Amino acid sequence: MSTTVLKSVLGAGALALLAVAGVMPVGAQDPGNGIDRTLTTAAIAPETGKPQARTVEIGVYDPHDAVADSDALTLEHVFVYWQKPDRVQIKRKFANAVRQGRGLMLSVEPYTHAADWRAGGNRLFADIGKGRFDREIVEICSRAADFAGQVYIRWGHEMEEPSERYPWARRDSEGYKTAFRYFVAKCRELAPAARYVWSPKGHRNLSAYYPGDDVVDAIGIPVWGLQKMDVDYWGRERRFVEALKEKYQRVSRYGKPVIVAELGVSGSADYKRAWYAEILDQQTYRRTFPLLTTVVFFNDKEPYKWPLGYGAPDWRLDREALKALAGRGPGQAAALAD
């Protein structure tokens, strides 16, 4: 790939992060706020035409707006609690996306109508099918339709790991699939140009929850690099490619574009730097993961405690990396790439 093409695709932010990582290219959510925000450089739609090794774009989950004004980011990702959306923040983020010339990804989290957002989860899928959440669907999808740019909608993520965290994550794969299809059918009536993202956690049982090719345009998966867990479970420190490989193999069978929707790295400075270097030196994995289109860094502390004593890992990017991403625009890409 020529330097000129690389500049135009990666943008200044990714090139700046390459420099921070020591590599240069060759040639959450808080119910009180009601919304989370991710900024990405995702280009989720698959390329057409002659097959080639694609350039994986780099994004960042940035709930505190550390890089909100970066010209390097082309997609703004908004987590929306569908039964209690923060309309003020949604309006602000939509406006910011317009101002920055970005597309939108809306991650719709289908909590229940209960005061704790989770009670009645056993009835959630049936209630959706009976139209009891149509008001939420209409509001979200109407807003999506009003946005002038491209919109991606990610509904009910990490559904195949039953837990108390998400009421839609249940041992009811048939109910989930039916609810997903209902949501997409209703939403398409209002926002026919939107694209839909199915986003499992990546476990072996994910295929039971796949709702069908006709309602899935892309697949998202999370990847986490936690140094202490690596050593405890694998006896060594792993890297990005190894951590991604198994999950990628499980979802690539569907032939859809793949997004690392949430990527967090927590550990020593050297551990994090090694992950950054491997992620950003795409020559190491572009051909290994031909369907991979986007990697989105999770730039925040973990909002929930991990089991087995791992606590709440700090996934935030290094200060230097954030500064580089926030402070460089496309006009400075040439100096970084040359």
Kindly label every feature range from the protein language model:
Residues 32-135, 265-268, 296-297:
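N-terminal substrate-binding region of glycoside hydrolase catalytic domains
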Residues 58, 76-78, 104-108, 151-155, ...:
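Hydrophobic faces of well-ordered beta-strands that scaffold small-molecule active sites
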Residues 65-71, 89-106, 140-148, 210-214, ...:
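Acidic (Asp/Glu)-rich catalytic clusters
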Residues 73-80, 207-237, 298-300:
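Aromatic- and acid-rich polysaccharide-binding/catalytic face
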Residues 92-194:
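Substrate-binding cleft of extracellular glycoside hydrolase catalytic domains
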Residues 92-109, 214, 224-268:
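Glycoside hydrolase catalytic-domain groove-lining segments
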Residues 187-206, 257-268, 297:
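Aromatic-lined carbohydrate-recognition surfaces of secreted/lumenal glycan-active proteins
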Residues 261-338:
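Substrate-binding cleft of secreted/luminal carbohydrate-active enzymes
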